C-alpha cells in the first residue's frame, strides 16, 4: 500500500486493490473518513468483485467515543470504508478548507437496499438488530416496496447460545449485504469480530435505522437535515440521549483547537 500527501498535507491517497476507484482519506482527530463522489457505486463494484467491505458511518459522537474506547477506535481504523455521516464531521472538514457532501448512513443503506430490490445481481440481504417485532416489521416494510427482496433477519435480543446459531446461519447463507443495528460501539465491534463469516459481503453498521424502517420512529424533517440539525430531533425523540450528546460540544472544541 502506497501513501502520498497532497500539497496541504491533509488528504492522503491510497492505492486500492483490483484498480478500484482510489478514495481520498481525510483525518478527523485520531480517525479519518474516506472521500468519494459515489459511495454506493464504490461498494457495489467491490461486491461484484467479491471483495468484503466493513462500512463505518462516522459522526462526532462516535469520534469522541473512539478516543475513550480503544477497541472501537481500532475497529474504525480497520474498516474498509468510513463515510462522513455526521454534520460535525462535515464542519470539521470545512474548517480546514475541504467541502464534501454528508453521507447519512441510513440513506446509504436505503440506496443499497433499493438497488438490491431493482436488480437480480444482489439476491440476499441481512438485517441484524432491533426488537423481535421491529426486525419483522422492518423486513416487511422493505418487501412491500420490493417484493423480490430476500432478507434474512435476526433481532438483537439473543442469548449467547442463540448468537452461536445465528453465526452458523450467516456462515451458511452468505448474505451479500449485512446491516447490523445493535448500537455503537457494539455493532462496529461485532462486525470487526465476525466479518470473516461472510468474507465477500458488505457489512454496514446502521444504528437505529431498523426502528425508522419499521415505522417506530421518524427521521427529522428535511429542513432540519438540510441545516445539519438532525441530532436535535433525535434528542427530542430520545431525551435519554442527552448524556451521549455531551460529546458534541467536546468534538466542536477539539475541532477548533486541532
Regions found by a protein language model. Give the residues of each.
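Conserved beta-alpha
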Residues: 90-169, 173-174
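Short, flexible loop segments at boundaries between secondary-structure elements
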Residues: 156-159, 201-237
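A short helix->loop->beta-strand "cap" motif at the edges of active sites that frequently abuts
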Residues: 52, 122, 198-201
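Proline-aspartate-enriched helix->loop->beta-strand connector
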Residues: 174-179, 184
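A transmembrane-helix-recognition feature enriched in membrane-embedded lipid enzymes
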Residues: 90-94, 219-258
Amino acid at each position: 500500500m502506497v501513501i502520498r500527501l497532497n500539497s496541504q498535507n491533509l488528504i492522503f491517497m491510497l492505492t486500492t486493490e483490483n484498480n478500484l476507484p482510489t478514495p481520498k482519506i481525510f483525518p478527523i482527530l485520531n480517525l479519518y473518513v474516506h472521500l468519494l463522489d459515489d459511495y454506493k457505486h464504490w461498494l457495489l463494484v467491490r461486491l461484484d468483485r467479491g471483495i468484503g467491505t466493513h462500512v463505518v458511518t462516522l459522526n462526532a459522537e462516535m469520534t469522541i467515543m473512539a478516543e475513550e474506547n480503544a477497541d472501537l477506535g481500532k475497529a474504525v481504523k480497520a474498516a474498509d470504508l468510513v463515510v462522513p455521516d455526521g454534520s460535525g464531521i462535515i464542519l470539521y472538514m470545512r474548517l480546514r478548507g475541504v467541502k464534501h457532501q454528508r453521507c447519512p448512513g441510513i440513506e446509504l443503506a436505503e440506496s443499497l437496499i433499493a438497488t438490491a430490490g431493482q436488480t437480480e445481481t444482489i439476491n440476499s440481504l441481512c438485517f441484524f438488530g432491533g426488537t423481535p417485532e421491529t426486525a419483522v416489521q422492518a423486513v416487511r416494510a422493505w418487501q412491500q416496496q420490493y417484493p423480490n427482496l430476500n432478507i434474512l433477519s435476526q433481532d438483537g435480543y439473543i442469548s449467547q447460545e442463540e448468537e452461536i446459531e445465528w453465526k452458523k446461519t450467516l456462515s451458511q447463507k452468505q448474505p451479500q449485504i449485512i446491516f447490523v443495528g445493535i448500537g455503537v460501539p457494539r455493532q462496529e465491534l461485532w462486525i470487526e469480530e465476525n466479518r470473516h463469516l461472510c468474507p465477500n459481503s458488505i457489512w454496514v453498521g446502521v444504528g437505529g435505522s431498523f426502528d425508522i424502517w419499521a415505522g417506530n420512529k421518524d427521521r427529522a424533517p428535511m429542513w432540519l437535515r438540510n441545516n445539519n440539525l438532525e441530532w436535535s430531533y433525535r434528542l427530542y425523540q430520545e431525551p435519554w440521549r442527552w448524556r451521549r450528546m455531551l460529546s458534541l460540544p467536546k468534538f466542536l472544541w477539539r475541532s477548533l483547537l486541532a
